[in-house]
Design a protein with these regions (language model features):
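Glycan-recognition and catalytic cores of secretory/periplasmic carbohydrate-active enzymes
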Residues: 1-172
């Protein structure tokens, strides 16, 4: 209707109908959480469009956009997925996006029963999510690049998504 917000394009996965999107795009946290919901709905409803979209997006993410640490979201601007095979050492790799990889992978394992999805869950958890929190549990990193010139952690952040996302995944 007239009160609807304008489309935000690939950033918000609303440039075209979700089921018509050939690849996972846009803001990495948004996209992985949306993909998690699609896979969970596919498990519940068995709808072929949901199943095909979840598999296509996961294959695209795991095959072309996933870092060795299980991180996603290479582009600093908009904290988003880059183009295929864009995997720079100074990539953004937001901690919450790795949590999204974990959730998406877990939902795909539930949907298909294939253990390969849990391999990626473990990769994201052990190499990115856990790296995003200090051993004390009191400090966090918002991003986890492969190569950095600093190792700062913060107790709070203006965008405080990491602490609750961390708690969500360790309780999964």
């Amino acid at each position: 209707g007239p009160e609807a917000r304008p489309a935000w394009g690939d950033y918000a996965q609303d440039s075209i109908r979700v089921f018509d999107q050939p690849a996972i795009v846009g803001h990495a946290v948004r996209a992985t959480l949306l993909a998690t919901g699609i896979a969970a709905a596919a498990y519940e409803n068995g709808n072929a469009d949901y199943i095909a979209t979840a598999k296509r997006w996961w294959d695209d993410m795991a095959g072309k956009k996933l870092f060795v640490t299980g991180g996603v979201g290479a582009v600093h601007f908009d904290e988003k997925f880059g183009h295929d095979y864009y995997l720079p050492t100074d990539a953004y790799l937001e901690t919450c996006a790795a949590v999204g990889v974990g959730f998406f992978s877990q939902a795909m394992n539930q949907l298909t029963g294939d253990a390969k999805y849990m391999d990626e869950f473990e990769r994201a958890l052990y190499n990115n999510v856990l790296a995003g929190v200090a051993a004390s549990g009191r400090q966090y990193t918002y991003q986890n690049p492969l190569n950095t010139d600093r190792s700062e952690r913060w107790e709070w952040h203006p965008c405080p998504c990491c602490p609750p996302m961390f708690l969500k995944i360790v309780s999964a």
